[in-house]
Amino acid sequence: MKTLVVALGGNALLQRGEALTAENQYRNIASAVPALARLARSYRLAIVHGNGPQVGLLALQNLAWKEVEPYPLDVLVAESQGMIGYMLAQSLSAQPQMPPVTTVRTRIEVSPDDPAFLQPEKFIGPVYQPEEQEALEAAYGWQMKRDGKYLRRVVASPQPRKILDSEAIELLLKEGHVVICSGGGGVPVTDDGAGSEAVIDKDLAAALLAEQINADGLVILTDADAVYENWGMPQQRAIRHATPDELAPFAKADGSMGPKVTAVSGYVRSRGKPAWIGALSRIEETLAGEAGTCISL
């Protein structure tokens, strides 16, 4: 049986602008898990998820209790792994004919000298109105940036260097478990064992995981059903197949597609195995080459 690493898009957990309630997340997860469950019957499956809204909410809750020093961001990432991993595991385990589902709290090594620490760009937390920027920055010391028509907090997002728990993940996969891991991009730590005040991009973490466990494929799921040429224009066209070199211009694109293209291209070049970008609702068609974008050499 082949091994797939699947990175869930944020819409699998929460739709943009939705309240960060457990009820909303369970409802979205319930829509996502049937397709994942079908995959789990044909592949050894490692599932990576994001945590941007959730870790931002935990940070807000953390700041609200003034009598305790706020927890650092790496601890909050670990908390979000437990919360989201539990929700996904509960929903997946309820699907018929599911193999065992296990959540692994995952640490990922980053460099303390990564230039991302000097230029925070990773969105976390709920969305705000642009006119709230000055008050939020003054109240919390945050850095804020526009995310579409909304405003969100940004934090450092260093490059993942090594997944410290990959051996455990690989062992569980070989034993037939569906493994939920590298949640929120993994808990960022440095080589001296210290946690790091950052959030790692989950697509880059998924690509690194696929490399380290020698997965047979990497699937990055997103709101868009493929990578498009001339996106948003009348002549837009879905790209069904491309090499990493052909997709290179898209790695510099604004928005969320750039990191996804960077992630899949790095994996394909490193391992020579295919990767796909597509929509969760069409994941089986994407793997069959009937939807999405396949990236290979």
From Swiss-Prot:
Keywords: ATP-binding, Cytoplasm, Kinase, Nucleotide-binding, Transferase. InterPro entries: AceGlu_kinase-like_sf (IPR036393), Asp/Glu/Uridylate_kinase (IPR001048), Carb_kinase (IPR003964). One of its GO terms (biological process) is arginine deiminase pathway. It is found in: Cytoplasm. One of its GO terms (molecular function) is ATP binding. This is Carbamate kinase. GO terms for cellular component: cytosol. It catalyses: hydrogencarbonate + NH4(+) + ATP = carbamoyl phosphate + ADP + H2O + H(+); carbamate + ATP = carbamoyl phosphate + ADP; hydrogencarbonate + NH4(+) = carbamate + H2O + H(+). It comes from Escherichia coli O157:H7. Pfam families: AA_kinase (PF00696). It comes from the Bacteria.
